[in-house]
Amino acid sequence: MPPWLAFERRIFVKRDAPEILARALRTGGERYLGLIHGDTILIGSATDPYQPAERRFRVTRRILEVLAEHPGLDIVIITKSPLITRDVDLLTRIARHSHIHVQISLITVDRELARRIEPRSPTPDSRLRALARLREAGIETGVNCMPVLPGITDDPAALDELVRRVAAAGATRIGACALRLDRSARLRYLPFIEQEFPELASRYKASYSHGRNVGEKYREGLTQRFNALRAKYGIGDGDRR
């Protein structure tokens, strides 16, 4: 089974992760807590913590229950799933004595386009509703517009609509960066482009022929565009200060 297919179909549930975390915090005492105080605890950097299996196994929720017992933490959660609203009670509890920030991943608000490029992901509207629900609960929430897909999700009018709706939902910031293609990702992504967006195939091959990043001129232009949109709609960038 190719890696990209295994990523979706072979789900390893770390059932005892909450207990391991609780034991480490309990037995490690101040030494262990000293390692995480002052640093950011990032949940969702490798896989979505609210993927469908979370409904059944509740691993993320139980981890949050453990973290809720320890004040003074800095926690960031990255997800594209509205399932996170299930845990609003815990998030607000944590926010009373720690800093917690949720980042919703969203690269387009076009439902039909989203269906083509993220066919098994929650709809853009459901993510925006989740964002609004978190903000209503007082949770600091932003958006990751990552990756921006050259020629697909970078239309100026589409990006304007994205930032407008993100700001209207109450997001405090939005971060963005262009698509990066490592060799393994290129082997999967370029055939997808040839199938779904054949008119862009030659452009992608040329743009990513010398490395994982699209050209500097494109990246600089994208940064300028998002800076202008942030200013227009009164929303911050992706950096937490």
Predicted regions and their residues:
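Conserved Radical SAM active-site core
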Residues: M1-Q103, I107-R115, P124, L128
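Amphipathic alpha-helical segments that form well-ordered structural scaffolds
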Residues: I20, V66, R133, G221, ...
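Conserved strand-turn element in the central/C-terminal portion of the radical SAM core barrel
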Residues: I77, V109-L113, E118-R120, R133-D155, ...
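Surface-exposed amphipathic alpha-helices with a cationic face
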Residues: T92-A95, L131-E136, N227, A231
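Auxiliary Fe-S-binding modules of radical SAM enzymes
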Residues: G151-R241
